[in-house]
């Protein structure tokens, strides 16, 4: 019989992380998943958000306020005091514009933490700081970030502390794509629209959306 023996060393004063790390609890613990939305949002609000995720459409400002409040409470519970619209400009790296939940003290001098649906849905970073791929004149500075409801918000932990990161698309005032995500989202929408036509030819009348998957290699065969 062949035996193998594993030796490992734990520095004095250190903890054995194997005993303390619970992968099931750690996985997505810093992500505002659908499960967390379902727990924290009213049933009607959750249904509206889920419908827009699946079928597209615009989120009402009233619903966005409810989602923003729940997202803020969750972020604060995880130690965040700031939020950022997180996007991918044409620089090859991500960009962030940080804002605080802290607004102003109340009459009793207590700190008020606020986050509105308007702040969740839309931001306005200085687009002149980022390349546009020649789409517009260099002096045009206006740019907008818009919440991508299909991508979950998450907590990013750095040396300065946790921050709520809200995945967004980055566009110009005229709707020109200034990032790498907007063309991807538009391509997915166009592909879904045409794929549904094919699905209908095969007799499926219930499907409303087709989701592409991206990998190192993807193939399909039509028989």
Q: How should these model regions be labeled?
A:
Residues 22-26, 44-49, 169-173, 193-194:
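Short amphipathic alpha-helical segments, especially helix-boundary/capping motifs
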Residues 18-31, 35-41, 201, 207-223:
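Active-site-facing alpha/beta catalytic cores
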Residues 16-19, 83:
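Positively charged, low-complexity intrinsically disordered regions
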Residues 141-223:
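Glycine-rich, acidic/polar active-site loops that bind/position phosphate-bearing ligands
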Residues 5, 23-29, 56, 149-152:
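Short, mixed-charge, low-aromatic patches
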Residues 10, 78-79, 215:
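Generic structural microfeature
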Residues 25-140:
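Active-site core of metal-dependent hydrolases
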Residues 1-16:
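Short, Lys/Arg-enriched N-terminal segments with co-localized hydrophobic residues
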């Amino acid at each position: 019989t062949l035996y193998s023996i594993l030796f490992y060393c734990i520095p004095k004063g250190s903890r054995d992380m194997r005993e303390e790390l619970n992968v099931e609890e750690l996985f997505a613990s810093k992500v505002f998943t659908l499960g967390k939305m379902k727990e924290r949002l009213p049933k009607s609000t959750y249904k509206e958000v889920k419908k827009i995720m699946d079928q597209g459409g615009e989120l009402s400002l009233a619903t966005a306020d409810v989602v923003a409040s729940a997202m803020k409470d969750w972020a604060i519970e995880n130690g965040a005091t700031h939020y950022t619209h997180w996007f991918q400009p044409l620089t090859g790296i991500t960009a962030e514009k940080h804002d605080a939940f802290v607004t102003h003290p109340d009459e009793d001098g207590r700190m008020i933490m606020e986050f509105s649906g308007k702040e969740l849905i839309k931001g306005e970073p200085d687009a002149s700081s980022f390349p546009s791929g020649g789409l517009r004149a260099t002096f045009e500075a206006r740019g907008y970030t818009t919440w991508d409801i299909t991508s979950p918000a998450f907590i990013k932990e750095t040396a300065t502390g946790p921050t709520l990161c809200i995945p967004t698309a980055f566009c110009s005032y005229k709707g020109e794509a200034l990032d790498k995500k907007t063309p991807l989202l538009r391509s997915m929408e166009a592909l879904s629209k045409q794929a549904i036509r094919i699905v209908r030819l095969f007799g499926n009348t219930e499907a409303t959306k087709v989701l592409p998957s991206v990998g190192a290699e993807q193939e399909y065969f039509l028989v």
